[in-house]
Amino acid sequence: MELIIISGRSGSGKSVALRALEDVGYYCVDNLPLPLIPELAGFLSNSGRSAVVSLDIRNIPENPESIEALLEQLSKLTIQTKIIFLDCERNTLIRRYSDTRRLHPLSNKDLSLESAIDLENTLLEPLYQQANYIIDTTNISSHELAENLRGILRGSTDKALKIVFESFGFKYGLPADADYVFDVRFLPNPHWNPELRPMTGLEQPVIDFLERQTEVHNFIYQTRNYLEMWLPMLEKNNRSYLTIAIGCTGGKHRSVFIAEQLAKYFQSRDKDVQIRHRSLEKHHKK
């Protein structure tokens, strides 16, 4: 039995997350007032049930000590508590609100949309810092968000650590869900070869180019060794996901190739591996 608290920025997908978890059998409560959460946790502890609670910014006090006191109170109960925080880039949130023409929950404070988003970010910081999992919904669909959540919940009963290798472009910003970020912008760049420029790191000519570079081989080898050294400690740390982000300038060539190579290596070592390329979709849209 466990209590899962879902919070995050307004517009980041909390309603989608709640529906997804309800679909897999969790008892879900939307916008439960903060003081009532310990009562729900006590009920769950006695009944042996699990539940999901979403926390809206309107139910979160401005005093961060209230959240810390709640978490301390929950830690004294026998039920396991996890916090999942949904994050999203500021510009994406602005676009989502513009598309739906809905009001931000803090707009009643006579704030502009941009100011409301920034204030909410400040108020949510204590929960962000306490979160067990952070999911960046900027570039993922509702289906992908639901799948990520199901993966996290499967990890609650499956002790195997899932290693996620993701490529990204620094020009689009850092992925918020990354545990480790490796910068490969110093490596030889296929972008400067006119024939390779329109291709990606998944295509054979780019693969051949990068495989000829000694620096690329050295980077992969040393990164692999670093991860292998610390994986046993991370696996003992009772975590479900380890997200390793590889970034180049545009997330199209070098980071894609290296993420693929690292993923293949750890798959060959019987690790539970997932791979995603965050920025490739942006290039396909051009």
Curated annotation (Swiss-Prot):
Disulfide bonds: none
Superkingdom of origin: Bacteria
Residues reported to bind GTP: 56-59
Entry annotated with the keyword Phosphoprotein: no
Nucleotide-binding among keywords: yes
Pfam families: PapZ_C, RapZ-like_N
Coiled-coil residue windows: none
GO molecular function: ATP binding; GTP binding
Residues given in the record as ATP binding sites: 8-15
Keyword terms of this UniProt record: ATP-binding, GTP-binding, Nucleotide-binding
InterPro entries linked: P-loop_NTPase, RapZ-like, RapZ-like_N, RapZ_C
Protein family (similarity comment): Belongs to the RapZ-like family.
Function of the protein: Displays ATPase and GTPase activities.
Protein name according to UniProt: Nucleotide-binding protein APL_0334
